[in-house]
A protein has these predicted regions:
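Conserved loop-alpha-helix segment in the C-terminal half of the alpha/beta-hydrolase fold
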Residues: 112-146, 152
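Post-His helix in hydrolase/transferase enzymes
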Residues: 152-164
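Gly/Ala-rich beta-loop-alpha elbow adjacent to hydrolase catalytic centers
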Residues: 1, 5, 9
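Nucleotide-sugar-dependent glycosyltransferase donor-binding/catalytic pocket residues
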Residues: 31, 49, 97, 122-125, ...
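Flexible "cap/lid" loop of the alpha/beta hydrolase fold
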Residues: 10-15, 22-50
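Conserved alpha/beta-hydrolase catalytic His-Asp/Glu region
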Residues: 36, 52-109
Length: 168
């Protein structure tokens, strides 16, 4: 799972452990803390705010280690593709009202896990990366010159690590 998908992967592995042999996490978000519900109407306002073009552009740039070199119109379009989906705003508002992902480290079991994180991840931040690095069961790999998207910032290296992990 990538980013919040990492929390989803951990929860799924906890719920159906016999169906999962290994997990790969890419810059997993939501491992620490407690869920914090954002009540109506703040959840709706927040979802609308996150749909603003300047906010989308800023979030997209934060995801990359070197945004001046890596972020163009195509990356901004990809980061905003969900805005074209019917119901995206209400779905995001509902997710915010639910409390989102937090504290999912409690789902870490004895399933092998490898975790790739960019050392320049400005979404998770240095404190979160340090906390992730300190969870022994996560088999942490820190990637230099990489942001929140190892599979995009360093696709060849990330795919090699992932392939080697699943073939071992």
């Amino acid at each position: 799972g990538a980013s919040m998908g990492g929390s989803t992967a951990l929860k799924l592995a906890f719920e159906i452990p016999d169906s999962i042999d290994k997990i790969i996490l890419l810059s997993p978000a939501g491992l620490f803390g407690e869920p914090k519900s954002i009540p109506f109407p703040l959840n709706q306002i927040g979802a609308s705010f996150l749909g603003l073009p300047q906010v989308r552009k800023s979030l997209c740039r934060q995801a990359f280690a070197f945004p001046d070199e890596c972020v163009g119109k195509m990356e901004e379009q990809i980061a905003s593709i969900h805005l074209g989906c019917k119901g995206w705003r209400n779905s995001l508002a509902s997710f915010a009202k639910s409390g989102g992902f937090a504290g999912t480290q409690k789902y870490i079991q004895n399933i092998p896990i490898k975790t790739l994180c960019g050392e320049n991840d400005r979404i998770l931040g240095k404190k979160e990366i340090k906390n992730i690095r300190n969870i022994e069961k996560l088999n942490f790999v820190g990637l230099q010159n990489c942001g929140h998207l190892p599979h995009i910032d360093l696709p060849s290296l990330s795919s090699k690590i992932i392939q080697d992990y699943f073939l071992e």
